[in-house]
Amino acid sequence: MGFTVNYFALISNTCQKIGVKYVSWTCDNPLISMYHVSVFNDCNYIFTFDKTNYLEFKEMGVKHIWYLPLAVDVDRIDMILQKSEDSIKYSGDIAFVGSLYERNSYDRIKPTLPEYLRGYFDAVMEAQLNISGANIVEPMLTTDILEQLQQHFSLEKSEGSFSDLGLIFQTTVLGFKIAEIERRRALIELSKHFRVNVYSNSNVSDLVRVQYCGSVDYWSEMPKVFHESKINLNFTIPNIKSGIPLRIWDVLGAGGFLMTNYQAEIPLYFKEGEDLICFDGVEDLAEKTGYYLEHEKERREIAHNGYEKVKQHHSYVNRIETILETIA
């Protein structure tokens, strides 16, 4: 049996050829490599964390695909936090760990687009930024718009790929630009009123009020940031249509207090207001940030509830057991 995190067509075809099972569990969505004819191979056992993505491939006729949310290794994180002697240097009021996607494809190609398309895409992105928990970009990329776009945007596909212009453009171009706008707007607004620490490889020189803390190692340092910060922020990239991104599990598994945008699958596993806090737009985020900075007891209770929930029900052991039972 072969196993990978995320799906690889070459490995699937190899496993199909030699007659062994190929198990993959996606942590990115949508995973462009899945839009390949090899996804129909009988050897595949594909697990995806986004239910919308699962339903899409199920409707295509992919037989061996299942929905499986991501998880967190609380025991590993507990060990890091217990042994830590430098946690205080990661403390702060508000923390954001992640990319600002300032090096995105949209900024590069925008000058080459006609004025109408630039205005249209700017309007689509602005509309998406005002809607929480749903992706509206895909239906806005109409046949007419895509026909105009293909004159200015070249689509390169590998042999066997059935990804199309709409999928590639909404994912690799608009999706990352929307994420950049959302994150910068939120951090700028919050930094007007609160102390905000940003841990990132991105260029934040234009965010004059934030405290730039450099990047942190995912395995050894990031849990300390989440544990020691009063409020941790998550902004789910719109490419993830309904699923719960890994960052949510990471924060809760470190015992951190989490404020996140709404995702459709959050209510399936967590109680908003008890395990984590959801915000709807920058104004709501700023208001709730002020409230929870002032209400420490409530904030700590919510962080503890989220931690206990992922510890008891959402470990990697739980998920691997599910995978093994499914493929048996």
Question: Can you annotate each of these PLM segments?
Answer:
Residues 1-61, 74-83, 214, 219-220, ...:
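Extended catalytic core of nucleotide-activated donor transferases of GT-like folds
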